[in-house]
Amino acid sequence: SPPFTSDQDLYTDSR
């Protein structure tokens, strides 16, 4: 998911 959805999603996208 894009890095602007949620904090949790941010970390998932940052892997």
From Swiss-Prot:
Details of cofactor binding: Binds 2 calcium ions per subunit.
GO MF: lactoperoxidase activity; metal ion binding
Leading EC class: oxidoreductase
Cofactor(s) in the UniProt record: Ca(2+); heme b
Enzyme Commission code: 1.11.1.7
GO term, biological process aspect, one: hydrogen peroxide catabolic process
Keywords for the protein's UniProt record, in alphabetical order: Calcium, Heme, Hydrogen peroxide, Iron, Metal-binding, Oxidoreductase, Peroxidase
Substrates-to-products reaction catalysed: 2 a phenolic donor + H2O2 = 2 a phenolic radical donor + 2 H2O
Function: Removal of H(2)O(2), oxidation of toxic reductants, biosynthesis and degradation of lignin, suberization, auxin catabolism, response to environmental stresses such as wounding, pathogen attack and oxidative stress. These functions might be dependent on each isozyme/isoform in each plant tissue.
Protein family membership: Belongs to the peroxidase family. Classical plant (class III) peroxidase subfamily.
Protein's UniProt name: Peroxidase 2
